[in-house]
Amino acid sequence: MKLTCVLIIAVLFLTAYQLATAASHAKGKQKHRALRPADKHFRFTKRCNNRGGGCSQHPHCCSGTCNKTFGVCL
């Protein structure tokens, strides 16, 4: 009888703990989901480097000019 009560209390405690942690994780995921569409849009937009920023074989300088000797945007 005592063992049964202890097991029931343990199961109730573990269930409550799982529900509490699942709720906190769900809130965290919801926060990241709100940022996800912006991340997808951000990946497809071209970013350019300002003057002094790095450039390489495929320059992405805002000015359109890359000094490939020094690897910087002009």
Swiss-Prot record:
Signal peptide positions on this chain: 1-22
Coiled-coil regions listed: none
Key words, A-Z: Cleavage on pair of basic residues, Disulfide bond, Knottin, Neurotoxin, Secreted, Signal, Toxin
Positions of the propeptide segment: 23-47
Tissue distribution: Expressed by the venom duct.
Gene Ontology CC terms, in alphabetical order: extracellular region
Record GO terms (molecular function): ion channel inhibitor activity; toxin activity
Similarity annotation: Belongs to the conotoxin O1 superfamily.
Protein name: Conotoxin VxVIA
